[in-house]
């Protein structure tokens, strides 16, 4: 029997990582409401931590998003994911992962049949990045490893950004690295001259 190895998964999983207050919720609140991200079916949003920003469940329902919360790392199990799959029958899953949990533990899990990680995105608060890198480097490395997009926000000081890019590229050469300040995306060409 021939198996189509290029078959797209039935349920695409988007894994969002980043430390607390790195902008995960803000990014997802924006993205989930955009026309380009809309699908016909249901999106299951799994929250693994509560940050400063919150989701409005009624607002999210307008975009076909249902929210489930996992309080403790021990509760995020293969069985729980199966239960959520049966309960919601999602077309897409977005996981806002807890920044203090090892991402590798989730990546080792057997996902429900038809689910596959489509994209891993990491958000970083540039104003606290150096502190996290110094004190929690192994967790940061896990977050960034295999990420397709690393988004640095709150980039008010442009001087260290080229070094931040190098820190990411060492771990995840394929990652697209984007820097944003309060006005939006920082011109990457300007970083070359810093």
Question: What are these language model-derived features?
Answer:
Residues 192-194:
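Conserved small/polar residues in nucleotide/adenosyl-binding loops
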């Amino acid at each position: 029997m021939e198996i189509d190895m290029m078959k797209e998964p039935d349920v695409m999983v988007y894994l969002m990582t980043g430390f607390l207050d790195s902008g995960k919720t803000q990014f997802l609140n924006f993205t989930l409401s955009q026309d380009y991200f809309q699908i016909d079916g249901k999106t299951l949003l799994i929250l693994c931590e509560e940050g400063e920003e919150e989701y409005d469940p009624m607002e999210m329902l307008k975009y076909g998003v249902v929210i489930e919360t996992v309080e403790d790392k021990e509760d995020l199990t293969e069985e729980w994911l199966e239960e959520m799959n049966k309960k919601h029958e999602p077309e897409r899953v977005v996981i806002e992962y807890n920044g203090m949990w090892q991402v590798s533990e989730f990546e080792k899990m057997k996902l429900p049949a038809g689910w596959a990680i489509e994209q891993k995105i990491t958000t970083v608060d540039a104003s606290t990045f150096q502190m996290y890198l110094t004190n929690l480097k192994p967790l940061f490395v896990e977050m960034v490893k295999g990420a397709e997009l690393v988004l640095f926000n709150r980039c008010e000081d442009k001087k260290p950004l080229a070094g931040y890019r190098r820190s990411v590229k060492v771990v995840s050469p394929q990652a697209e690295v984007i820097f944003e300040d309060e006005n939006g995306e920082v011109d990457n060409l300007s970083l070359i001259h810093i």
